[in-house]
């Protein structure tokens, strides 16, 4: 029997904790493991060595620190979890990971961009809703 998977996206905000608690409920209900995703900013491309390498290490450390409490909470709840720290924009990469991992469900927060940029680009949640191959649960 294939293991069921739920993709859970976190951005490190306080709202991410609500997303995790909701994901725990659904993971238990579906007997599913969690693919925990955090998308960090792109690595700088204009810096030369060794500054670029230092920037990459700093970015990855911040991402690992950000995702750690969410991974810990899932493990405390006895949910199997796999971490994915991704460079690409969240709205593009979340549906791709869900497809590759054959996820049953994506759990995301309702928070989106609220500035002028958000009007033109749309929110991460909106993009995920319209491009994902599976069901999406939006946590308010």
Can you describe what each PLM-predicted range is?
Residues 44, 91-93, 115:
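Generic structural signal for helix capping and beta-alpha/helix-loop junctions
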Residues 2-50, 73, 77:
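Small/aliphatic-rich secondary-structure junction motif
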Residues 31-33, 79, 103, 134:
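Short glycine/serine/threonine/alanine-rich loop segments
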Residues 35, 82, 137:
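Conserved beta-strand positions in the Rossmann-like core of class I SAM-dependent methyltransferases
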Residues 25, 96-140:
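Gly/Ser-rich helix-loop-strand patches that form or flank binding pockets
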Residues 1, 72-106:
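Structural beta-alpha unit
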């Amino acid at each position: 029997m294939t293991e069921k998977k739920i993709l859970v996206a976190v951005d490190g905000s306080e709202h991410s904790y609500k997303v995790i608690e909701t994901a725990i409920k659904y993971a238990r209900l579906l007997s599913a493991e969690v693919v925990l995703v955090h998308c960090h900013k792109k690595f700088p491309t204009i810096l030369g060595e060794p500054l670029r390498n230092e920037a990459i290490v700093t970015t990855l450390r911040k991402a690992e620190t950000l995702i750690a409490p969410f991974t810990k909470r899932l493990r405390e709840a006895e949910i199997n979890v796999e971490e994915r720290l991704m460079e690409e924009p969240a709205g593009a990469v979340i549906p791709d990971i869900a497809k590759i991992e054959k996820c049953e469900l994506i759990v995301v927060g309702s928070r989106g961009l609220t500035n002028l940029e958000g009007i033109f680009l749309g929110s991460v949640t909106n993009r995920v809703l319209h491009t994902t191959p599976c069901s999406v649960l939006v946590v308010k």
